[in-house]
């Protein structure tokens, strides 16, 4: 069996690993359009801040190691078209320009997503950067130590934008974050959390300019200013982090796509064409808290999808179990994590929810290491089933969110969670874990 895998990031990499595990005798061809195999953009902040010294180490696997395991690895090589009826792909060598046709028995594509860029006046000025991929990582790193870069403007206040803002603030730059939304990280966290994080960022030389729309860039050859509908900001460097779009324009007319360009797949990762599977950021994914399909661009999601595509390669035997959309991030001294439904997602889905928020020290009063923690538990008011949670502290409590992710997947209720068994040791916790405490408050709220 000959299997072709497109994409060397999260989903593609995991598909290759699972192929080696379940189909060791398969002929595997692994294609990457770029010149570098398996770069992890989610590790870029560690490199920009100098915690990781070698940009080439920010990866899952080298092409050489995969070659030694029997995989035929092709970098600088683009699959430009699929001919599903013939079980063929058109392949272009981006160095030589030569094209060829490759046959396949099975095809797994993980085309990913590409960053949105603002189509506004001045967009062609120099020093307007993106934050995705190895080449941009190298360019951004150079700017962290460039003495001519003093004012950095980040457009977008999601995870990528906040990572960029923190990296440049730590490099001693004056940073402004602009977003059309009314608060930073508003897609991931509710207001009681983002209020605290906004104060933390402002205390670290970051200006938060939310509720503003960028209208144009200004400059002479290179960007010097950003103008919004409300203000103007000096800018020696602009980092655009306003989301992504699926890299699927080349698939129109070949595979069935949703109106937004995402690839239609079933619960076995199969596309509309036989023997063609799709995974990762260019697909929808089963979202357990709302029992629906949404697009959640997370590495963990793509990795699991890659594995399940291979499990179902020959027969549809393992339906994808779904995800809760769990994620986390550090913002200077604060660490937070979230899973499932928050207020923004509930409104988007039209789902009624109730919630309780607990703010307390996570250790006993006598423990000098105690730190304040914020925990919000979201549940269904009719069934009392757990739907989501958010957690934040200067202590790293983020792993606790994994318990809530499991609770959502297991369809646990607030009553189940209130008396769930968590260990107690004064150096690590309190007799009632903050998860228990929040669930108990929810039970009281429903009496």
UniProtKB/Swiss-Prot annotation:
The modification Cysteine sulfenic acid (-SOH) is found at residue 42. InterPro entries: FAD-bd_OxRdtase, FAD/NAD-bd_sf, FAD/NAD-binding_dom, FAD/NAD-linked_Rdtase_dimer_sf, Pyr_nucl-diS_OxRdtase_dimer. Its EC number is 1.11.1.1. Keywords: FAD, Flavoprotein, NAD, Oxidation, Oxidoreductase, Peroxidase, Redox-active center. The active site is at residues 10, 42. It holds the Pfam family Pyr_redox_dim. It is an enzyme of class 1 (oxidoreductase). GO terms for molecular function: NADH peroxidase activity. It catalyses: H2O2 + NADH + H(+) = NAD(+) + 2 H2O. Binds 1 FAD per subunit. Its cofactor is FAD. It comes from the Bacteria. NAD(+) binds at residues 160, 179, 188, 243, 297, 328. The active site is the redox-active Cys-42 oxidized to Cys-SOH. The oxidized form is stabilized by a hydrogen bond formation with His-10. Peroxidase whose active site is a redox-active cysteine-sulfenic acid. Belongs to the class-III pyridine nucleotide-disulfide oxidoreductase family. This is NADH peroxidase. It comes from Enterococcus faecalis (strain ATCC 700802 / V583).
